[in-house]
Curated annotation (Swiss-Prot):
Protein name per UniProt: UDP-N-acetylglucosamine 1-carboxyvinyltransferase
GO cellular component terms given for this protein: cytoplasm
Pathway: Cell wall biogenesis; peptidoglycan biosynthesis
Residues recorded with modification 2-(S-cysteinyl)pyruvic acid O-phosphothioketal: C115
Length: 420
């Protein structure tokens, strides 16, 4: 397993180009299974989860290639089962189920793996597909869905806001007979992006981005070209990198309008922020950030995927900050690691109380999930001495060349291959 070796402290400064959003590219790639003609998807990040998805689509019989863009031709899909060996590394595989059953009347997906944060059952996906008329059984570790003829439109009320299940229902409903309404739908920008992609192929989806999405079923989807939205979490991570190191940054090829809650908290922490149509600049003017109070909630609230980075910000800020996690349980696994670097914090159930310290010290730490590991790498950039971050395969699942981008900002970071 690779490690990162980071030598600090560094004040990060410069420009970074933001990659496409993992959380939009994944559902869009799976939704390409619905199309009977070739699609071209631009701005897809280079990540392990993307590679796994492309491999999975290939195993289902799609032609998939990458040359700048990702090209998917699902016209000859003839296998309807997503096997355990690919699914086990990535929860997103469940997104194959809706498109398979909607277009081919059958689909099966092994129960998924992915980050070890909290309970993320597939129940809501299953509930949604059953409402659309699919018969679903769980056997031998697989979720198996079938339908006679086409799925039927339905009025579906989600009892919990779920990005994953909203994607599943919306994708499957594009080919259902009649109209589907999803109430209490997730409102994330990645949902909007997936809907825009499907509409490009001929779907009739309206209301994405609100809590009520309407899908008028169509008989088939064609081909098209689509560009994935920039990654708001990668953007936020690099903005925090500059903020905690008292530096400055310009993020290019991003979408400021997807980051309102994060930008508001960074301003509260004392950052000077300017925005343009596709760029954000942040300047700390050499000052230490001020502690902020953060409560995660579904979009447009403060994103859970930025919680670990703001934990770090509070741990090196002036004052005491409180962070409350309302989305996932067990999502403070980075905090004990940061305490080993000299941070001061107490965890009380779903809240972490952060007492800002003036400096952190390098240590050997372990990545536990995707966003937590990013915060450990940023901690290494600002800590005195050497930090070794172990198990960085988590980072490779969600950040496109993070070490290259940090190096361009002045970080002293290298990837150490296990055999060295």
């Amino acid at each position: 397993m690779d490690k990162f070796r980071v030598q600090g402290p560094t004040r990060l400064a410069g420009e970074v180009t933001i990659s496409g959003a993992k959380n939009a590219a994944l559902p869009i790639l799976f939704a390409a299974l619905l199309a009977e003609e070739p699609v071209e998807i631009q701005n897809v990040p280079k990540l392990r989860d993307i590679d796994t998805t492309m491999k999975l689509l290939g195993q289902l019989g799609a032609r998939v290639e990458r040359n700048g863009s990702v090209h998917v031709d699902a016209s000859n899909v003839n296998v309807f089962c997503a096997p355990y060996d690919l699914v086990k590394t990535m929860r997103a595989s469940i997104w194959a189920l809706g498109p398979l059953v909607a277009r081919f009347g059958q689909g099966q997906v092994s129960l998924p793996g992915g980050c070890a944060i909290g309970a993320r059952p597939v129940d809501l996906h299953i509930y949604g597909l059953e409402q659309l008329g699919a018969q679903i059984v769980l056997e031998e570790g697989y979720v198996k869905a079938t339908v006679d003829g086409r799925l039927k439109g339905a009025h579906i009320v989600m009892d919990k806001v779920s990005v994953g299940a909203t994607v599943t229902i919306m994708s499957a409903a594009t080919l259902a007979e009649g109209t589907t309404i999803i109430e209490n739908a997730a409102r994330e920008p990645e949902i909007v992006d997936t809907a825009n992609f499907l509409n490009t192929l001929g779907a009739k989806i309206s209301g994405a981005g609100s809590d009520k999405i309407t899908i008028e079923g169509v008989a088939r989807l064609g081909g098209g070209v689509y560009r994935v939205v920039p990654d708001r979490i990668e953007t936020g991570t690099f903005l925090v990198a500059a903020a905690v190191s008292r530096g400055q940054i310009i993020c290019r090829n991003t979408r400021p309008d997807t980051l309102d809650a994060v930008l508001a908290k960074l301003r509260e922490a004392g950052a000077e922020i300017e925005i343009g149509e596709d760029w954000i600049s942040l300047d700390m003017h050499g000052k230490r950030p001020k502690a902020v109070t953060v409560r995660t909630s579904p979009h447009p609230g403060f994103p859970t995927d930025m919680q670990a980075q703001f934990s770090l910000l509070n741990l090196v800020a002036e004052g005491t900050g409180v962070i409350t996690e309302t989305i996932f349980e067990n999502r403070f696994m980075h905090v004990p690691e940061l305490i080993r670097m000299g941070a001061q914090a107490e965890i009380e159930s779903n809240t972490v109380i952060c007492h800002g310290v003036d400096k952190l010290s390098g240590a050997q730490v372990m990545a536990t999930d995707l966003r937590a590991s990013a915060s450990l790498v940023l901690a290494g950039c600002i800590a005195e001495g050497v930090t070794i971050v172990d198990r960085i395969y988590h980072i490779d699942r969600g950040y496109d060349r993070i070490e290259d981008k940090l190096r361009a900002l002045g970080a002293n970071i290298e990837r150490v291959k296990e055999h060295e």
